[in-house]
Amino acid sequence: MKITLSSYEMELVRKKLAREPNEAEWLTIDALWSEHCSYKSSKVFLRSFPSEGEKVLMGIEDWQDAGALDVGDGWAIVLKLESHNHPSAIDPFNGAATGVGGIIRDIISKGAKPIALLDMIRVGNLSNPRNKWLLKNIIAGIGFYGNSIGVPVVGGELDFDDSYNDNPLVDVAGVGIVRKDKIVPSVVKEPGLKIVIVGLTGLDGLGGASFASRKLSGEDEIGAVQIADPFAGKIVLDVTLEIADKVEAIKDLGGGGLVVGVTEMANGLGAIVNLDKVPLRVKDLKPEEILVSETQERMLFAVKEENVNEVCKAFEYYDYPCAVIGEFVKEPYIKFLYGGKEIVSLPSDLLLSPPRFIWEIKKPKLIKSDKKPEVGLEESIRAILSRIISKEWAYSQFDYEVGTSTVLKPGEADSALISLPNGKLLALKGDANPDLCAEDSYECGKSIVAEAYRNLASVGAIGIGVVDHLQFGDPKKPEVYYSFVEAIRGIAEASKFFSTPIVGGKVSFYNENKEGKAIKPTPLIVMAGLIKDKFLRNKVVEDSYITLIGFTRDEMRGSLFGKIFGNYGEVPKARLNEDYLASQLVVNLINDEKIFFAKDINKGGLIASLFSILVKGMGVEIETSSIPSDTDDWIPKLYSENGGRFIVLTNDPEYIIRKSKGIHISVIGKITKDQGIIKIDNKEINVNKEIDNYYNYLYEVMS
């Protein structure tokens, strides 16, 4: 197992301890000081995130496994977002499957029942056979675990870009439901509690936290990938929820394994653990391997002595291993024993106080152009629409209706929608925009929060909270670090503006190949929202009016049009007040039952939003002169991706205008019965070929 600590960090350890640590202690420090566990290159900036709010029950707190939001009537939702990027690049099936399993265990560690999953996947171009292999196995792994354990995958994203050729991104978000007075902490508050482990410890996942904290080397790193067992995971899920009121704290044994789980759960107290008592899957494991193994389907409990027997009996009923391996103590030292000898004895504050780094920052030099590409209307439409594809091939492999709480199916709307036990509806949406982030990560950070807010509004929901995942290359590279810091600034600003506090998140650095080529900056957020009144299930009605809410701007840089034909102009600025006002208007129109279709304008611009109507078997006709804009140029009118805009379908546009209160509103066209025909300024274009491609592309290329 490799030690990833720098020479500076190793010397710092020696100075603080006034001695040379042994091998087991070096592995312990390496795991807890890894970027994956310590956030040593990011924590300084993450403190700018808003984490408090009216509905926040558990926010960004050290060592809590998930955030919690109040959804009324004594109920809370628990939110978590994680990735398994590095493991999925090596073993995509198990990497993705264990990513789902880890999220499930993070949710149940709060005493919550998992009710929904979202997956956000990014791989390279599918013309590359390896990328097809990655995608096929990533989807299979997610489906295998989610379907087997009985938690629906209700939505997500699927995106392709060459920057992910060697580094796929596999993000999974989970939501659970729990009575808010039954939320279980992940840390202990008093000594004397017994440390109980459930599950068998094996050789898989050795050094996984350190593996996730460096770039892929091209060497055989399969041993750092954990093996998924959803059937064991189902036992862990059910029994953990059964005994949740009998324990004082719960923690998933995830990144860094037992040594990280015990240290974080101790939360500054001490712990004494006997490794001889840890149930093993493989005989003769070395103590160092027991310490940092990341074998899946294991949990750690802090239990009062009088409840230990009841907790273990519940697991042993299913022949699932359960053992008392130690105790939390007042003395702030983490100690591990093996064979009657003390092999680790380290101060808690040393382990939980890694050095913090602020690396050099340098603004990337981007090649800018003001030269507009020369392209015709029909050529541009066909090029854009050919990039927009149905994700049905992926989500058809998931059981998205298990549990009977799914209200809107994947692909049916811009947001997932699930029912809660109190009768309310919860909306969920994940958003990222790597193309924009590659141009301006500050505006990108703001825009992904704003887009998620609009996505929720399009089904009738108002955002209440956010979890984030920040995925970048090597933080020691000044241009990468600049993008990272600026993305945080944008996300923080927008989250404060929309009153959607960030209740949890993750940072993933070193997403680059062995040549040092990094992915595009990919900050991702998942926003949760509540329906206060009515929700919208989109339908397209012939002769209804296509009404544009919002103002279109000549801001083309970072757009899908720019990606295809060449970037030019300025990046779209996130004007958060416009997003807020437009979103509130759409929610009000849904509640007033004055619209029957709503779609925010984002990737691909207005044309892409109109395409979501065309694929439903109708036609559209619009006049570009009716589009409120700062330009007469048809290209930005059709393809700009600036925010604050929706298209809605209505039979009463005058009502919308009366309710708009200063927001730009314009009837730009009508729905026709001419299937697959888009008519723009009296020019008809048949896009039935692109509609066929939309439905069939993934099925054909992945066959």
From Swiss-Prot:
The active site is at H36, H84 (proton acceptor). Mg(2+) 1 binds at E82. GO terms for cellular component: cytoplasm. Keywords: ATP-binding, Cytoplasm, Ligase, Magnesium, Metal-binding, Nucleotide-binding, Purine biosynthesis. Its EC number is 6.3.5.3. GO terms for molecular function: ATP binding; magnesium ion binding; phosphoribosylformylglycinamidine synthase activity. Mg(2+) 2 binds at D106, D252. ATP binds at Y39, K80, D468, G505. It is found in: Cytoplasm. It holds the Pfam family AIRS. It catalyses: N(2)-formyl-N(1)-(5-phospho-beta-D-ribosyl)glycinamide + L-glutamine + ATP + H2O = 2-formamido-N(1)-(5-O-phospho-beta-D-ribosyl)acetamidine + L-glutamate + ADP + phosphate + H(+). InterPro entries: PRibForGlyAmidine_synth_PurL, PurL_linker, PurM-like_C_dom, PurM-like_C_sf, PurM-like_N, PurM-like_N_sf. It is an enzyme of class 6 (ligase). Its main location: cytoplasm. Pathway: Purine metabolism; IMP biosynthesis via de novo pathway; 5-amino-1-(5-phospho-D-ribosyl)imidazole from N(2)-formyl-N(1)-(5-phospho-D-ribosyl)glycinamide: step 1/2. SUPFAM superfamilies: PurM C-terminal domain-like, PurM N-terminal domain-like. Substrate binds at S83, H84, N85, H86, R105, Q226, E294, T295, Q296, S508. Coiled coil: none annotated. Part of the phosphoribosylformylglycinamidine synthase complex involved in the purines biosynthetic pathway. Catalyzes the ATP-dependent conversion of formylglycinamide ribonucleotide (FGAR) and glutamine to yield formylglycinamidine ribonucleotide (FGAM) and glutamate. The FGAM synthase complex is composed of three subunits. PurQ produces an ammonia molecule by converting glutamine to glutamate. PurL transfers the ammonia molecule to FGAR to form FGAM in an ATP-dependent manner. NCBIfam families: FGAM_synth_II, PRK01213.1. Monomer. Part of the FGAM synthase complex composed of 1 PurL, 1 PurQ and 2 PurS subunits. Belongs to the FGAMS family. HAMAP family: PurL_2 (MF_00420). This is Phosphoribosylformylglycinamidine synthase subunit PurL. The lineage of its organism: Archaea, Thermoproteota, Thermoprotei, Sulfolobales, Sulfolobaceae.
